[in-house]
A protein has these predicted regions:
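Hydrophobic/aromatic residues within transmembrane alpha-helices
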Residues: 21, 32, 36, 84, ...
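Loop-to-transmembrane-helix transition segments
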Residues: 1-7, 35, 55-80, 150-158, ...
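Hydrophobic transmembrane alpha-helices of multi-pass small-molecule transport proteins
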Residues: 44, 107, 116-138, 193, ...
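Helix-helix packing/entry segments at the starts of transmembrane helices
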Residues: 32-35, 74, 78, 92-99, ...
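Glycine-/small-residue-enriched transmembrane alpha-helix faces in small-molecule transporters
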Residues: 1-34, 71, 144-171, 191-195
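Membrane-interface helix termini and inter-helical loops of multi-pass transporters
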Residues: 16-27, 83-86, 135-148, 197-211, ...
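Specific transmembrane alpha-helical segments of multi-pass solute transporters/efflux pumps
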Residues: 10, 15, 45, 49-97, ...
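Hydrophobic/small/kink-forming positions within alpha-helical transmembrane segments
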Residues: 12, 16, 70-75, 79, ...
Length: 289
């Protein structure tokens, strides 16, 4: 359980680092994603090499699935999140991103025909009531309100992509193991980020202040590589229900630290909405004993 707590808290610092980068220097999401993924790539390749003799061996179809899931769950979800964080605070952004367990439920119902229980439907109503409160507190007129809603939409799309990644990758993870799946999918997902950067951005985009490079290195290692493998091991040890319960620490810690460290406004209405989101997600994630 200690691993799950550490992994969740470490991972929760990611949006704060992203916001610190944006405050420090006008870095584009394309450049920031390139830095994060290219710096983390050697670590994923090292783990992939270490696990190279593991069974079962992957077929060509397996590799195609791993690549597609890495694209959806790591590249696309991260890119959308980075875009959204330009317009919404780190705390609010995490609360929206934390919707992914409820989206997993909806995707499973629509495509796998798994009917939700009454308890799960109740959780959905509570969760999205919380989201409505969070968004309504910022849904005022003018450019600022429109940009906030745009950012919230991007973060929601990120959550949807991540939920799709979890649903589609469930069977493959069970067959090849979480560590192999994480290392392979994350490594392969780096390719589109690299191609995107060299197509869109000039090399001068990498002429960044030292502080930005430090943030990028910490973002790639401390809040990406480290928590991904810690959480994978924790999930294997304690199971999904307990892991989901501990995962509630994430948006709470981000809301507190972003309010203190980034001077982000977090209103009483947003706090109430956030509490409803967390309660609803826990209701849908934690099974009755």
């Amino acid at each position: 359980m200690a691993l799950a707590v550490v992994g969740t808290l470490v991972f929760s610092f990611r949006p704060i680092l992203v916001k610190l980068v944006y405050v420090t220097y006008p870095v584009s999401p394309v450049t920031l994603l390139f830095l994060r993924m290219s710096i983390s790539l050697p670590f994923f390749l090292a783990v992939a090499w270490w696990l190279r003799g593991s069974e079962p061996r992957l077929t060509a179809l397996d590799w195609a699935k791993v690549a597609a899931l890495g694209f959806i769950g790591y590249y696309a979800a991260s890119f959308l999140d980075f875009i959204g964080l330009q317009y919404v605070g780190a705390g609010v952004g995490r609360l929206i991103l934390y919707l992914y367990p409820t989206l997993v439920l909806l995707i499973s119902f629509l495509f796998l025909h798994r009917r939700p229980t009454r308890r799960q439907l109740t959780a959905l109503v509570i969760t999205y009531a919380g989201v409505t409160l969070i968004l309504s507190s910022q849904a005022h007129g003018g450019a600022e309100g429109k940009l906030f809603m745009l950012g919230a939409l991007f973060v929601f799309a990120s959550s949807l992509f991540y939920a799709t990644y979890l649903v589609a990758g469930g069977e493959l993870v069970k067959r090849i193991g979480s560590m192999r799946f994480t290392a392979y999918s994350m490594a392969l997902a780096t390719l589109p980020a690299v191609v995107q950067f060299f197509v869109i951005e000039p090399m001068a985009a990498l002429e960044l202040p030292t502080k930005v490079w430090i943030y990028a290195i910490v973002l790639a290692t401390f809040t990406t590589v480290l928590p991904l493998f810690i959480q994978a091991e924790a999930l294997k040890r304690i199971g999904a229900p307990e892991f989901a319960l501990i995962g509630a620490l994430g948006p709470v810690s981000v809301a507190i630290t972003s309010a203190l460290g980034l001077d982000e406004r977090f209103t009483a209405v947003q706090a109430l909405g956030g509490a409803l989101v967390i309660f609803g997600v826990l209701l849908v994630s934690v099974k009755r004993s």
